From Swiss-Prot:
Free-text function comment from the UniProt entry: May have a role in the ERAD pathway required for clearance of misfolded proteins in the endoplasmic reticulum (ER). Promotes survival of motor neurons, probably by protecting against ER stress.
Subunit note: Interacts with ERLIN2.
Residues bearing the modification N-acetylserine: 2
Protein name: Membralin
GO terms under cellular component: endoplasmic reticulum; endoplasmic reticulum membrane
Record membrane topology: Multi-pass membrane protein
Organism: Homo sapiens (Human)
Chain positions with Phosphothreonine modification: 29
Length: 620
C-alpha cells in the first residue's frame, strides 16, 4: 500500500542558490492570479493601449484634444437641454390634442388617431357606422362627399395598408377566413372579396404615426373587414402639426418632426382620455404593431432606491457575463494558435460558450421586460460593455481607477432614475444623454490622467536611450543604488575589505571620480526623481522605468568590459593585471577606486616610483 507523500521543497541549485522560483524584485507585488492567460491578455491589451495612446498624442496636438473634449461636452449639454425642454413642455403640462372629442368618442367602439401633415380630409369622421348609429353622435362633422362606395374604397386601401405592417400576425391568426375567394356568393362587399396577396406590396412609411384606442382589447385585434361587417364604430381623428396648437411652438415642432417623432405625443393625448375612464383601456400602435395597456401607477420618491438597486444588479450581471465570455474566447484563440503551431489536439469549449450565450440572451430578455423595449436593453448592454472595456484597459493611474467608475455609475443611474420615475417616457433621449456624458468622462480622464502618465513614461525611456555610452575611462563598477538590493543606504567603502574596481579611475582634483564617472548614477537618480515627482499615480510607470534602467545599464557594462579587456594587458603600475572579480585579491594590494594609487600603500614601493600620469594614460 502506497502512502501519499508531500512534495519535497525545492533543493539548492548548482551554485548554492534555491532551486525554486526567484522572488519578486523591488516594489513589484506578487502575482496572485493563478491563470497565466489572464496576465498575457492584460499585457497584450496594455501594450496595444500604450501604442495607440502614443500614436494619438503624436497625430493630434493638445489644442485639438481640448477642442474635441469641449465639443463632446457641448453635445452632451445640448441633448440634456433638449430633454429638459421636451420634458417641461410635454410632460409637465397636459397635452390636450384630443380634448375636442373627450365627450363624444365611441366608448363601445374604437378611437383612431392619425398624424398627417397638410391633410385635406375632415379632422373627425366616423367609419363602419350605419345610418342609425350616426344619430348617436350629434354635431359630428361628416367628411364631405363621402358615401358608402367611396368609404368602401377607402377601407379597402386602409386594409391593404394595415396588413402591410408587422401587425399582420394578429389579424391572420384571429380572422383566417375573412377574405373569401372571388367566386364565393357570400361576400358582403368588395373589400372582403379582394384576395390578400402572399407578399404585401405596401408597408407603413416611417413618417406615419397611427394609434388606436379602445376599452375592449378584442376590438383592436379585429381586421378592418370584420369591423365593418360587425358595424363597430371607428372614430378617426386627424391631427395636423402645422395647424394644431397642442404641438407647441415652432421650436417644439422642429424637435418633434426632426428628432423625437410623434409617438409620445399620441400616447400622452390618449392617456389624457383614459384617465377619465373607469376602465383604462388598451392602446395599439398600428405602424409597429405593439399593444399597450393603461394602468394606474404612482411613483413616489422612494422609487429612486428601486431604480438604483436594479441598475446595480443589471450592470454587475452584464459585466460579469461579458468578462467571462471574453475569457472563454481568448482561451479558445490561444488553444487554436497552439494547435496550429505545435500540431496538437484541442477541445472546443462548447459548454462554457453556450452557457454564457444563453445567460446573455436571458439577461437581455429580462431587461427587455423591464424597459418594455428590446432596443433599449441592447444599447444598455452595449454601453456596459464599452465601460467595462475602458475600465479594464484604459484605467491605470490610481485617480482614474478611483474616480471614473463613480462618474459612470452617476450618469448611468440618472438614466435609470428618469426611466423608472416617468414610466419610460422619452427614455431613448435620456439614454442618449447618459451615454454622451459617459463618453465625455472617458475622454476627460484619458486626456488629463492617462495620457500624461504615458507621455511621462515615454520621456523617461527616451532619456535612458539618449544617455552617453560608457567609454573606456568610465568606471564599470555598479552604482550604490544598483548594488544595494535591500534598499538601505550604501555605507562608506572600506579600503581593506572593498573588492578592486574593474578598471582604473580618472581622479579629479580632490581625489574623487570625474564627472564622466557619475553619469550612470546621476542618470538613474534623475529617472527616479522624475518618477517620484509624478506622485503615487505613476507606480507602474516607475517600475517599468526601473526595469529599462537595469537592462540598459547592464548592457552598457558588458559592452565596456569587452572593449577594455584587450586594451589593458598590464596593471596601472606596470605589473600583472588584477585578478578576476570572483577571486579574492591580497589585502595589501587592495585599493579603493576613490583613493589615489600612491596613497594606498604606507611605505615606499616600486609602484610609488612610477609616473603619476600612468593611470590616466592607460585609462585613455
Amino acid at each position: 500500500m502506497s502512502e501519499h507523500v508531500e512534495p519535497a521543497a525545492p533543493g539548492p541549485g548548482p551554485n548554492g542558490g534555491g532551486g525554486g522560483p526567484a522572488p519578486a524584485r523591488g516594489p513589484r507585488t506578487p502575482n496572485l492570479n493563478p491563470n497565466p492567460l489572464i496576465n498575457v491578455r492584460d499585457r497584450l491589451f496594455h501594450a496595444l493601449f500604450f501604442k495607440m495612446a502614443v500614436t494619438y498624442s503624436r497625430l493630434f496636438p493638445p489644442a485639438f484634444r481640448r477642442l474635441f473634449e469641449f465639443f463632446v461636452l457641448l453635445k452632451a449639454l445640448f441633448v440634456l437641454f433638449v430633454l429638459a425642454y421636451i420634458h417641461i413642455v410635454f410632460s409637465r403640462s397636459p397635452i390636450n390634442c384630443l380634448e375636442h372629442v373627450r365627450d363624444k368618442w365611441p366608448r363601445e367602439g374604437i378611437l383612431r388617431v392619425e398624424v398627417r401633415h397638410n391633410s385635406s380630409r375632415a379632422p373627425v369622421f366616423l367609419q363602419f357606422c350605419d345610418s342609425g348609429g350616426r344619430g348617436s353622435f350629434p354635431g359630428l362633422a361628416v367628411e364631405p362627399g363621402s358615401n358608402l362606395d367611396m368609404e368602401d374604397e377607402e377601407e379597402e386601401e386602409l386594409t391593404m395598408e394595415m396588413f402591410g405592417n408587422s401587425s399582420i400576425k394578429f389579424e391572420l391568426d384571429i380572422e383566417p377566413k375573412v377574405f373569401k375567394p372571388p367566386s364565393s356568393t357570400e361576400a358582403l362587399n368588395d373589400s372582403q372579396e379582394f384576395p390578400f396577396p402572399e407578399t404585401p406590396t405596401k408597408v407603413w412609411p416611417q413618417d406615419e404615426y397611427i394609434v388606436e384606442y379602445s376599452l375592449e382589447y378584442g376590438f383592436l385585434r379585429l381586421s378592418q373587414a370584420t369591423r365593418q361587417r360587425l358595424s363597430i364604430p371607428v372614430m378617426v381623428v386627424t391631427l395636423d402639426p402645422t395647424r394644431d396648437q397642442c404641438f407647441g411652438d415652432r421650436f417644439s415642432r422642429l424637435l418633434l418632426d426632426e428628432f423625437l417623432g410623434y409617438d409620445d405625443i399620441l400616447m400622452s393625448s390618449v392617456k389624457g382620455l383614459a384617465e377619465n375612464e373607469e376602465n383604462k383601456g388598451f392602446l395599439r400602435n398600428v405602424v409597429s404593431g405593439e399593444h399597450y395597456r393603461f394602468v394606474s401607477m404612482w411613483m413616489a420618491r422612494t422609487s429612486y432606491l428601486a431604480a438604483f438597486a436594479i441598475m446595480v444588479i443589471f450592470t454587475l450581471s452584464v459585466s460579469m457575463l461579458l468578462r467571462y465570455s471574453h475569457h472563454q474566447i481568448f482561451v479558445f484563440i490561444v488553444d487554436l494558435l497552439q494547435m496550429l503551431e505545435m500540431n496538437m489536439a484541442i477541445a472546443f469549449p462548447a459548454a462554457p460558450l453556450l452557457t454564457v450565450i444563453l445567460a446573455l440572451v436571458g439577461m437581455e430578455a429580462i431587461m427587455s421586460e423591464f424597459f418594455n423595449d428590446t432596443t433599449t436593453a441592447f444599447y444598455i448592454i452595449l454601453i456596459v460593455w464599452l465601460a467595462d472595456q475602458y475600465d479594464a484597459i484604459c484605467c491605470h493611474t490610481s485617480t482614474s481607477k478611483r474616480h471614473w467608475l463613480r462618474f459612470f455609475y452617476l450618469y448611468h443611474f440618472a438614466f435609470y432614475a428618469y426611466h423608472y420615475r416617468f414610466n419610460g417616457q422619452y427614455s431613448s433621449l435620456a439614454l442618449v444623454t447618459s451615454w454622451l456624458f459617459i463618453q465625455h468622462s472617458m475622454i476627460y480622464f484619458f486626456h488629463h490622467y492617462e495620457l500624461p502618465a504615458i507621455l511621462q513614461q515615454v520621456r523617461i525611456q527616451e532619456m535612458l536611450l539618449q544617455a552617453p555610452p560608457l567609454g573606456p575611462g568610465t568606471p564599470t563598477a555598479l552604482p550604490d543604488d544598483m548594488n544595494n538590493n535591500s534598499g538601505a543606504p550604501a555605507t562608506a567603502p572600506d579600503s581593506a575589505g572593498q573588492p578592486p574596481a574593474l578598471g582604473p579611475v580618472s581622479p579629479g582634483a580632490s581625489g574623487s571620480p570625474g564627472p564622466v564617472a557619475a553619469a550612470p548614477s546621476s542618470l538613474v537618480a534623475a529617472a527616479a526623481s522624475v518618477a517620484a515627482a509624478a506622485g503615487g499615480d505613476l507606480g507602474w510607470m516607475a517600475e517599468t522605468a526601473a526595469i529599462i534602467t537595469d537592462a540598459s545599464f547592464l548592457s552598457g557594462l558588458s559592452a565596456s568590459l569587452l572593449e577594455r579587456r584587450p586594451a589593458s594587458p598590464l596593471g596601472p603600475a606596470g605589473g600583472l593585471p588584477h585578478a578576476p572579480q570572483d577571486s579574492v585579491p591580497p589585502s595589501d594590494s587592495a585599493a579603493s577606486d576613490t583613493t589615489p594609487l600612491g596613497a594606498a600603500v604606507g611605505g615606499p614601493s616600486p609602484a610609488s616610483m612610477a609616473p603619476t600620469e600612468a593611470p590616466s594614460e592607460v585609462g585613455s
